[in-house]
Amino acid sequence: MIWLRSSVVLLIFLTLITGVAYPLLATGLSELMFPYQAQGSMVKQDGQTVGSELIGQPFTKAIYFQGRPSATVDYPYNTLSSGGSNLATTNPILDDEIKRRVEQLRQFNRQPDIPVPVDLVTASASGLDPHISPAAADFQAQRVADARHLPIKVIKQLIRDNIEHPPSEFLGEPVINVLKLNLALDNLPEKKQ
């Protein structure tokens, strides 16, 4: 009977430590040391929350850059069902999806002969990636410039200004946060002469 009592005491003790004390301590420290990140890296414009730096969102208008496709079900970029599509590279369904996406992107961007960057036609592992490659942004630049009646050089400079470099070259490739890039677009004057 003594072993049962000590087991229950140990269970209660570990539950309080790992289920209450540790989460409260971790949350409190993160709120003190990293408040922006602890709150989800929410991006605000004019006092309104417009999204998170960490979660992609759909942009369908021609005046905006588009992100990677979402692999989530129900609706795009659904954080409750994040995860990859789990389709193998040899799966014909994935092949058909990629072909369909390539055709849609070529039509939407009026780029019938230019290769479509792979990150515009494949979802990330989480299905929620907010970043695209500089090549993916360049692929869309002419469409965005035309839709906004801006010179292409203005859009190309904005792309360069929004490239985020990894801390070291072996830790990843340069990326662009689509939400930040689109907000920077919205902050440009409507026409530049």
UniProtKB/Swiss-Prot annotation:
Keywords: ATP-binding, Cell inner membrane, Cell membrane, Ion transport, Membrane, Nucleotide-binding, Potassium, Potassium transport, Transmembrane, Transmembrane helix, Transport. It comes from the Bacteria. It is found in: Cell inner membrane. InterPro entries: KdpC (IPR003820). The chain crosses the membrane at residues 8-28. One of its GO terms (molecular function) is ATP binding. It is a single-pass membrane protein. GO terms for cellular component: plasma membrane. Belongs to the KdpC family. Part of the high-affinity ATP-driven potassium transport (or Kdp) system, which catalyzes the hydrolysis of ATP coupled with the electrogenic transport of potassium into the cytoplasm. This subunit acts as a catalytic chaperone that increases the ATP-binding affinity of the ATP-hydrolyzing subunit KdpB by the formation of a transient KdpB/KdpC/ATP ternary complex. PANTHER family: POTASSIUM-TRANSPORTING ATPASE C CHAIN, POTASSIUM-TRANSPORTING ATPASE KDPC SUBUNIT. The system is composed of three essential subunits: KdpA, KdpB and KdpC. This is Potassium-transporting ATPase KdpC subunit. It comes from Photorhabdus laumondii subsp. laumondii (strain DSM 15139 / CIP 105565 / TT01).
